[in-house]
Amino acid sequence: MPYTAPKASVQLHRLTPTGSVVPAKSSPPTDTSRCSAHAVPESVARHHNHAVGPNQCCSTVVQPIAAPVHSVWSVVRRFDNPQAYKHFVKSCHVVVGNGDVGTLREVRVVSGLPAENSTERLEILDDERHVLSFRVIGGEHRLANYRSVTTLHAEPAAAAAGGGTVVVESYVVDVPPGNTREDTRVFVDTIVKCNLKSLARTTENLAAACERLSA
């Protein structure tokens, strides 16, 4: 059955639009927090340490996927094609770069969200350790200074079944005026969870198709 993205309007909470957001001044960091409660290899653990300012929040979402890491990474690493699994993305256009670190993309989102578009910069693309990070640097939205880090890890328990993956995605973002940290965390967590569940469906189907072809 094809995956249908949930209606965004029921998940808005108090994050209502108030107009354009320009690149905001970063809040002075007061703490460096490990947002991930999930155990990750030491080689990538530092990527989930976020400097959290007094008007910011951070969180982590973990998603197991019944597909090998290389299959999941082939989808995640495509900075130019987030709509492959992010169903809140309407379109994406690369404006600078060719997919390497420093690449800029313009993302337009579906109607119903408190946003219209965002400009995002690729900060990390590590094909060896399976790490991708980007930050929002402009656009019309409510998530100023948003920075996301995604890491992929092999799931040893699923090795006998052809391999499995654990995806860990953490982020830090400014709390919009008129909202609380909890408002912001619940809203962004909901979006990230929807994205990662869609990633699981997409890559599990991809892995199954590859397995059928090789049978």
Name each region found by the language model.
Residues 2-100:
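Hydrophobic ligand-binding cavity/cleft-lining segments
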Residues 2-4, 64, 70, 77-144, ...:
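Glycine-rich portal/gate segments that line the openings of hydrophobic small-molecule binding cavities
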Residues 3-6, 135-194:
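Beta-strand/loop substructures that line and gate deep hydrophobic ligand-binding cavities in soluble
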Residues 196-215:
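Short, highly charged C-terminal tails/helix-capping segments
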Residues 54, 58, 65, 111, ...:
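Amphipathic alpha-helical protein-protein interaction segments
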Residues 59, 118, 146-148:
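Hydrophobic core residues within well-ordered beta-strands of beta-rich domains
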